[in-house]
Design a protein with these regions (language model features):
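Amphipathic alpha-helical interface elements
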Residues: 2-84, 90-218
Length: 219
């Protein structure tokens, strides 16, 4: 095995390590949400879900803008964060209806003393979900036979939260790919051998792994 093949094997190993960290943390977060909401009423579940999703949105923004404290103040509300994330290309525009629906549901509770979430409310929520988020909900809820509104609510909210959390990690990977594309283009333009490129790729992957571990430790 030559030096390039050795480094390529290391790169594959690092990529698997990153995927493992990412998958484990996401699964852990979902289980935590389902556990801590046991015994809570619908209002508590919605408020907690809204809070968790907003936390992920703020993390996404803080990791991708300069001087975040200048804009992420107490007056910068949930939908402001959604709109800013979309404007900066950090969140797909197609996700807006999903997150807005969560905010609308939360506001219904805030403004109606006797509001109770219904099956129709949840079906309306699911109907505006992006396909990826909807598929995640369907996977969580597929083995539920009884009509349990609270469980359905928890599965809806955990699907949205998982999407927000994944977006934070995926953006870090995208930044790594952008760096590698730029380096590859420089190599083509100014010269540079494959071994140098792969060595740099390994270095950047290690930095990415450390970055993701740092983000995970924020919890």
């Amino acid at each position: 095995m030559n030096s390039i093949e050795v480094i390529e094997d290391e790169v594959v190993s690092i990529l698997k390590g990153i995927a493992g960290i990412f998958s484990f943390k996401i699964a852990e977060q979902v289980n935590e949400f389902l556990t801590v909401t046991d015994g809570e009423d619908s209002l508590q579940i919605i408020l907690r879900g809204h809070l968790y999703v907003e936390y992920e949105l703020e993390r996404l923004l803080r990791h991708n803008i300069e001087n975040p404290d200048s804009i992420l103040t107490d007056r910068f509300m949930f939908m402001n964060k959604i709109n800013l994330a979309i404007a900066l290309g950090l969140l797909p525009k197609s996700r807006k209806n999903t997150y807005k629906k969560l905010n609308d549901l939360r506001n219904k509770y805030a403004h109606k003393l006797r509001f109770e979430v219904s099956d129709k409310d949840l079906d309306d929520f699911i109907s505006v979900m992006d396909e990826e988020v909807k598929d995640d909900f369907s996977e969580k809820h597929k083995d539920v036979d009884v009509k349990d509104i609270k469980l359905k609510l928890k599965h809806v909210l955990s699907a949205v939260w998982m999407d927000a959390s994944k977006t934070v990690y995926i953006r870090e990977v995208e930044k790594y790919k952008e760096q590698m594309d730029a380096v590859r283009e420089l190599c083509r333009t100014f010269g540079g051998n494959e071994e140098q490129f792969i060595t740099l790729k390994r270095q950047k992957l290690l930095e990415l792994k450390e970055r993701i571990e740092f983000i995970i430790d924020e919890y």
